[in-house]
Amino acid sequence: MTLTDTTIDWDLATDALVESLRDLIRIASINPPSADAPDGELRAARYLATTLEGAGLTPELVEPVPGRGSVHIRLRGDGTGGDPLLLLSHLDVVPAPPERWTHAPFDADLADGYIYGRGAVDMKGMVAMELAVILQLAAEARAAGLDPARDPIPGLRRDVLFTCTADEEAGGAAGAAWLVEHRPEWLAAAGAVNEAGAVSTTVAGIRFYPIGVAEKGYAAYRILVSGTWGHGSMPREDNAAVLAAAVIGRLAEPETIRLTPVMTRFLDDAAAALPAGAARVARAIASGDDALSAATLEGLCDRRDAVVLRALLRDTISPDVIHAGVKYNVIPGDAVIEVDCRVLPGTTESAMRARLVERMGPELAAACTIELIIWGEPVEAPAEGSLFDIMAQAIRDHDPDGVPLPVMVPFATDAKYTAHLGVPTYGFSPLRFEADERLLDRFHGVDERVSVAALRWGLPVLYDVVRRFCG
């Protein structure tokens, strides 16, 4: 069944989606929980459970840590189509100090066609969109005289799982990681639809829809720098703050380009769609020549896109925290640097650590001890095959001028846990943005917002993907 076979009122469905999203934003599911909102994730999970129960469904809710809730529902197909499709989302949001917001971050204001609030794009908008698809499928079952909690949904050959987790923003220990150990059936599927992909980005007048098929791995390190304590009136070369500054200077230099298969495909597909001049730039970047790429990158896209693209072409090292010194006239003998590294597929933790030492050089490295804080493997899914092809075709059907293409994202999501279960997981939260809008400007940003028009476009796209993959 496709959209052309239905009489769904998508405007009415979008109105309900918008109200669900606004309700969810008003639940301050902040991670880490605050004294003012200690149980926001649990309240968000209960909201979804209550909404699903109102549609005649029987959701499950778990609370592995007090105040941290995850929720799940399974809609049944007739069992002839193989393993399920997983619609995966998270309920938690990062903090949102309100001082610079023009609309309070948890008021869910609707202004000028946009819904404002923390979580509008990361990722309660997708939660509400997935919820709308589930409610639509349940309504179709009821219209056929069936019980959606028990009977197969008309036209579905696979089950559809809808799982919303806690704790994604802090690593997932109280969310997806717990589910892998205790409720793996909530995640086990033939494929998963996740956040951070299929949101349009306009380059050289072309609307691209990058579908996330890979995520960089991550390694955080604590670098302990040893110097000699002394009096500030007698400067010395082994001042730990000075040594730390030198370390940071060396680590901050960009790594060399290393093209992965996903990014080679991304650049090739982009070049095929771009006007001639921009296409030449894309091919120049794909050549892997560092000097050429650095000079030409911003000829392909604006600075916002260039920052992202640079990160996807290399391993990255970002010194983000430094502590040194106790008083202005005391030379510090110790300093601490915390470094965020994001690694391409093929880079191991030991290789990243060795690279830090190499970048420091032997003299500085001798003054440093490197401790691993956290490590996560890169994640990859096939950039071809049934689910990817269905997602790409759904975008083309709803935006004939749009260009879907595979991409890697620079950050980590709950896909790192579904990958442990062998579930190919894709960044696919379809939204059609205006030409000057960028998704990553909104993630964790001030005045986070999403337009009603973008949601109205994305809802039938997601519904089509579910129907086509599961039908």
Across the structure, where does each feature detected by a protein language model lie?
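Active-site-adjacent substrate-binding region
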Residues: 248-257, 277-282, 291-294, 382-432
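Short pre-catalytic strand/loop immediately N-terminal to key active-site residues, enriched for Gly-Thr
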Residues: 111-122, 404-405, 446
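C-terminal substrate/ligand-recognition segments
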Residues: 327-360, 376, 380-395
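Zn-dependent metallopeptidase/amidohydrolase metal-coordination segment
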Residues: 375, 401-470
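Acidic-enriched catalytic cores of C-N bond-cleaving enzymes acting on peptides and small amides
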Residues: 184-191, 197-206, 211-220, 232-322, ...
